[in-house]
Amino acid sequence: MKRGRQMLRADGLSLRFGGLQVLDDLSLTVGEGRIVGLIGPNGAGKTSCFNCLTGIYQPQAGRVSFDGRDVSRLPTHRRAAAGMARTWQNLGVIDSLTVTENVMLAQHQRTGYSAVAGLLGLGGTWLRERELRRDAAEIIDYFGLGEVAGVRASELPYGVRKTCDMAMALASDPKMLLLDEPASGLSPEEAHDLAGTLRELRDRLRLTILMIEHHVPLVAEVCDYVYVLNFGRLLTEGRPAEIQRHPEVIAAYLGGAAATAEGGEDGTA
């Protein structure tokens, strides 16, 4: 995918663990303001790809560029500070904290001081903390979490905790969201609501989104473009409708789900 300005680019990523080739010369690009899907069967290398993009893993070969800058050697926190925000398949929320506390904790990635310093009001941070609390309330309301703002994450249903996880990602004021199976564990109604949220984040906030997802109807509905991995390699790429018809994709991953997935061309030029 080469149209428009590139927000994220990976070139020739190769990752090995001992004798296991996890990623094999993988390249992809994500254009600014687009929603791009990363799909494939279990063990295809999707999460390992995310780990390389965000700096958790250091690949043996390849490079990663973000917002026009080579970030290949930057640690995870520096990439986050540059504007990458990630959600996790197993959630990044802290169960012992309330929704508000989780969101405010995520905000501290962009404050220049620690959450502990903010909690204690050290160095005049109390004024900034007041601003953060106001911003956190706006984010919480945006995601419809106002009624549970003071509830500990451990007491919330799984779907609500996933929404909290996304609110935390947005709280870091990112340029790009990397979402790891955002629809996992959601009901069909919740997945439909998620699709609307993702489109609004793209259209209203101009966020760029790359998401790993097994929920084929969601991918078909919201993604402008899709990359398909299999055994650590790029199997194919294209618009959702093209991917759904691709015989190798059907054989490797989609199977009968392709016939029932709704959605067509993405409507982009």
What role is predicted for each listed range?
Residues 2-269:
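Glycine-rich phosphate-binding loops of nucleotide-dependent enzymes
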